[in-house]
Regions:
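Exposed boundary/loop context
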Residues: 8, 26, 277-280
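Bacterial N-terminal signal peptides
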Residues: 15-28
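Short linear sequence elements within intrinsically disordered, low-complexity coil regions
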Residues: 10, 19-21, 112, 370
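Flexible loop/hinge segments at secondary-structure junctions
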Residues: 34-382
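A general, composition-driven signal for non-globular sequence regions
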Residues: 4-5, 26-28, 97
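N-terminal secretory signal peptides that target proteins for export/translocation
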Residues: 1-12
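Sec/Tat signal peptide C-region and signal peptidase I cleavage site
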Residues: 29-33
Length: 382
C-alpha cells in the first residue's frame, strides 16, 4: 500500500477540511454514546483498600473530553467585614481525599488564619455518625447518608444532619461515583423506564401510586414478551448503589421506599451486569463502570410526562440524566440558626465558580450546574 501526502504548499480543499472535522466530532460523540465497557472491573484487594484508607484512591485517567464550567455560576466574594479564623477538623471519603485538600488549599488563600484539617483514615463508609461524636465539624461524603446515619444523629440532636450537594459524580470512573443505569438483555425490545415503573417493579411500598409490575407485557411489550416474567436483580441493602436508586425512584417526600423481598439480591454490584447478560428476561441496575457491553442500557425518565434521557456523556455533564450521582458536604447545623461563619464560607466557596473550577482542574468529578449550586447555597439560610 502506498501513502500519498499533500504538500504543505498546496491549498487544501475547504470541503475536505470540513469533512475531516465533522468526522472527528462524530467519532468523539460515538465514543461517549457507546458507554458500556467490554472489560468489567474487579473488586479491590485488601492491600488496595489499605492504601486508599491512608492516602485516598489513586485518580483514574480523566475522560478525553471535559465539561465546560457553567457560565452562570457566581464568582466567589470573600468576606471583608470580619476576619475569619479558627481550626476545624473534618473527614473525607477515599475518593474525595485529593479533591478535598485541593478545595482547602484554594480556600485558605483567602483566609490564611483558617485551618481546615482533614487527615486519614479516608473511607467510603464515612457519614453523619462521625459528626455525632463531636470531634469532627464536617464530613465530605461520596454517597447519600444511611438511614442509621440520619436516625442516630437525630436521636442525639433532635434534628437531621445538614447535607448539601457540592459536586457532581463522575461519568464512568470505577469506584468514583459513576452514573447509574438500568440494563436488560440485548434481545429485549424495551427502550426506556420511568421512575414510576421502577417503583412498581422493585418496591413493595409503591409510594408513586402504581400497581405492581411483574411481566414485560405490563411495560408495553407484546408478542412472545407479553406474558414473560421480569427477573429482577438488585444489590442487597445496605449499599450505596441500592440506597441511591431507593431514594431517587422508590421514595417520595418523607416516605421511604422498601424493596420487594423476592428480588435477586447480590452482595455487591459486580455480578449484576453479567447476570442480566445471561438471562433474556432479566432487569438490573448498576453503576456505568460495572456495566458490560453485552447488555442494553435503558433511557430513563424521572416522570411519565418528561423525556426519557439516555445515559451518555452530554446528558450526565449537564445533569439532565436522572441517575447522575452527587457529592455531599455534611455538618451539624441547627434549624433556624446560621452555620458557623467559617464553614458557611467554605461551602459558599465550593459552590462558587472558583470552587467548581477546582473540580474541573482535577478532571475526574463533574462540576455542578448553576441551578444545582444555587439549590445547595439556599440550604444555608437559617
Amino acid at each position: 500500500m502506498s501513502l500519498h501526502f499533500i504538500p504543505l504548499h498546496r491549498r487544501l480543499n475547504f470541503g475536505f477540511v470540513i469533512s475531516i472535522t465533522l468526522l472527528c466530532i462524530l467519532a468523539t460523540m460515538t465514543l461517549h454514546a457507546q458507554v458500556p465497557i467490554a472489560r468489567l472491573p474487579k473488586p479491590p484487594t485488601p492491600p488496595e483498600q489499605a492504601q486508599w484508607k491512608e492516602h485516598g484512591r489513586t485518580l483514574p485517567t480523566p475522560e478525553a473530553r471535559q465539561p465546560v464550567l457553567d457560565a452562570a455560576l457566581p464568582a466567589y466574594e470573600p468576606r471583608r467585614d470580619i476576619e475569619l479564623s479558627g481550626h476545624f477538623k473534618g473527614a473525607a471519603s477515599d475518593v474525595l481525599a485529593i479533591l478535598t485538600h485541593q478545595w482547602i488549599a484554594a480556600f485558605q488563600k483567602y483566609y490564611p488564619k483558617v485551618t481546615l484539617d482533614v487527615q486519614p483514615p479516608y473511607a467510603g463508609s464515612l457519614g453523619a455518625l462521625e459528626l455525632i461524636k463531636g470531634d469532627l465539624q464536617f464530613v465530605m461524603v461520596s454517597r447519600e447518608l444511611k438511614p442509621t446515619d440520619v436516625s442516630g444523629f437525630a436521636a442525639k440532636f433532635g434534628y437531621a444532619p445538614f447535607s448539601a450537594p457540592i459536586s457532581g459524580g463522575t461519568f464512568r470512573h470505577f469506584g468514583f461515583l459513576d452514573a447509574m443505569g438500568f440494563v436488560v438483555h440485548p434481545d429485549n425490545p424495551l427502550k426506556q423506564l420511568t421512575f414510576d415503573q421502577v417503583d412498581a417493579i422493585y418496591s413493595s411500598t409503591h409510594h408513586r401510586g402504581g400497581k405492581a409490575i411483574t411481566t414485560w407485557g405490563q411495560l408495553g411489550l407484546t408478542g412472545e414478551w407479553a406474558d414473560k416474567p421480569i427477573h429482577v436483580w438488585g444489590v442487597k441493602p445496605w449499599n450505596g448503589f441500592e440506597e441511591f436508586i431507593r431514594q431517587r425512584a422508590l421514595s417520595v417526600g418523607d416516605k421511604r421506599g422498601e424493596w420487594r423481598t423476592d428480588i435477586n439480591f447480590t452482595e455487591t454490584v459486580f455480578p449484576i451486569s453479567p447476570a442480566v447478560a445471561a438471562d433474556r428476561y432479566a432487569l438490573g441496575y448498576a453503576g456505568l463502570a460495572y456495566i458490560g457491553d453485552n447488555v442494553k442500557l435503558l433511557d430513563i425518565a424521572a416522570d411519565a410526562s418528561g423525556p426519557a434521557v439516555p445515559l451518555n456523556y452530554d446528558e450526565v455533564i449537564h445533569a439532565r440524566y436522572p441517575l447522575c450521582r452527587l457529592v455531599f458536604f455534611n455538618t451539624n447545623k441547627k434549624p433556624g440558626q446560621p452555620l458557623d461563619p467559617v464553614l458557611a464560607e467554605f461551602l459558599k466557596f465550593i459552590l462558587s465558580r472558583e470552587g467548581q473550577q477546582v473540580i474541573l482542574d482535577e478532571a475526574i468529578f463533574i462540576p455542578l450546574r448553576s441551578e444545582q449550586a444555587n439549590a445547595s447555597r439556599a440550604l444555608l439560610a437559617p
